[in-house]
Amino acid sequence: MAALDAIREALPEPARDIKLNLQAVLQPGTLTPAQRWGVAVATAAAARNERLLAAALADARAEVEPAVIEDALAAAAVMAMNNVYYRFRHMVGKASYAEKPARLRMNRLVKPAASKVDFELFALAVSAVNGCETCVRSHEQVVVAGGLSEDQVHEAVRIAAVLHAAAVSLELAGYAAVPSAAAAAG
């Protein structure tokens, strides 16, 4: 976890909790290494921070097969589209939109490179980051029906939350060095 350790060290003091959580959530728990690192890569991609994604990819490549990483990146890409589309349908609340076919290609959901259940878990984590209630509910049902426990789902969402917070915290690092208005005036 050397690359993500470097990210942890780059986080500013206001993100101290995130620094500690980033180390904790990626330790072995209820998820397999493929699930843990797939969620980390997918949510780092969804957070759109190049530094964080590069670090997650570097550490994941040392732990899992390339197919897992490919699926994680595909989940981030497909969910970037689906989360917007299905969140709109949910938010507008009109039956007429719900009846319209999506007509959006999402073949990777059906044919992932590695595990179908793991791909759905990656999609669930990204959907949580992107705030799509419909997608979160749908993917949660699929992974639980596929044999994952609520503890595993919970662990995946904890990873997603911390990776997202790490991306935000990396952005804060540039502002932490900026003097406050009071300090500049004094």
Curated annotation (Swiss-Prot):
The active site is at C132 (proton donor), C135 (cysteine sulfenic acid (-soh) intermediate). Pfam families: CMD (PF02627). Its EC number is 1.11.1.28. It comes from the Bacteria. Signal peptide: none annotated. The keyword Cell cycle does not apply. Keywords: Antioxidant, Disulfide bond, Oxidoreductase, Peroxidase, Redox-active center. The keyword Disulfide bond applies. One of its GO terms (biological process) is cell redox homeostasis. One of its GO terms (molecular function) is hydroperoxide reductase activity. It is an enzyme of class 1 (oxidoreductase). Transmembrane segments: none annotated. It catalyses: N(6)-[(R)-dihydrolipoyl]-L-lysyl-[lipoyl-carrier protein] + a hydroperoxide = N(6)-[(R)-lipoyl]-L-lysyl-[lipoyl-carrier protein] + an alcohol + H2O. Disulfide bonds join C132-C135. Belongs to the AhpD family. HAMAP family: AhpD. Antioxidant protein with alkyl hydroperoxidase activity. Required for the reduction of the AhpC active site cysteine residues and for the regeneration of the AhpC enzyme activity. This is Alkyl hydroperoxide reductase AhpD. The gene is ahpD.
